[in-house]
Amino acid sequence: MLNKIKNNIFLKSTLVLLIGGVIGKLVGFVLRIIVTRKLGAEGMGLYSLLAPTSSLLSVIATLSYPTALSKIISEKSSRTKTLFTSIIPLSIIINIFIIGITILLAPTLSTLLKNETLYFPIICLSLVTPFISISSIIKGYFWGKQNMFPYMLSNFIEQITRLILITLFINKFLSISLTHAISFIILVNAAGEVVSQLVMMYFFPKNIRPSINDFNKNDIKKVMDICVPSTSSKIIGSISYFLEPIVLTNVLMYVGYSKDFIVYEYGVINAYAMSLLLMPQFFTQNMATSLVPELSKYYSLGNNEMCKKRIKQIVLISCSIGGLSTLIITLFPTFFLNILYHTTLGLDYIRLLSPFTILFYIEYPLINALQALGKSKSAMKCTIISSIVRLISIASLSLLKIGMYSLILSIIINLLLSTYLYTKEIKKVLSN
């Protein structure tokens, strides 16, 4: 068994990611508990309202670089040196535009969210994106080489950095205001990304030093050919997620709910219910990451049977992890909420969501599988359909005056639909 693992790069990469993921997630989870306890339901509500904007900016900034670069590097279709020399300048230009546009739109966005206090935190989100972008480019190299240790170690040290900074200074910013504390937490992410980059660069081959002479337009085209359809799918999903709190807040206020109620309950759902139910989701995300280069390689060789085998393995493991964790949390929700967050808020939301939570765990591997199979356009089509349905369901269900249950029900509808669509597309691709 040990010899089999040693000789199987996919298994080694997955195991390294899982072990490193557990360690990194434990630190990240401690950090999340500290932040949640410090900010409270109201603070987490405000922080959660910013999460969709953060997700959208990150998707645009990273442009699916890890997936694209890992695919190109694993197929050995370009020189690594020219890849980095070509992509980094493009990334810098894109991030300058992101910062400028975000600063211009921040007042409008904070007004749409019915919370003008979010103006400065929104600007802080844009200032973090360049650091996230550069990190994603470096990660793409190690993913393509299926060398997951540098990525794992950098992720762990990044979390430790964030934990130390937030533990030391969060109270000082809270004494000023919730807005200052939230802005500080956002900016700490930039410090974590810088530390992560330094760790990964230590493991980077010394012979790869980007030079202006290595700039290659063809490399940009190769990366963009993968990034554009792949990112288009993610951007559509992120735009839907971005519009979620705007649509939800405005429709619920229209039918009579107060702004304070919406912020508070939105915080309860995201900070307590969803956070608890999705605790082990990093397992499936890490496995899906290691799946991309492996699946790309077999698909390029025309080995559909091996592709099916790998996808089935990941989905089976994901279902096992998701099913077991959901069962335990569903049986003892009060215990976990009390011990982790010192609250019992979110119990009803957990009970309603738990039967469908397993779909969260298999959704990410299915999306990555489609992208690895070169079917980013199919993934985009599925995302467009499910995103439109989600927004329509949020708006229409909110009109029924059922409070935040309109959001819960729309999440369930979206999960069922998107899982069905992704599965259908994968079967179609591999049946040819």
Go through each PLM region and give its residues.
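Alpha-helical transmembrane segments of multi-pass membrane proteins
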Residues: 100, 115-137, 165, 187, ...
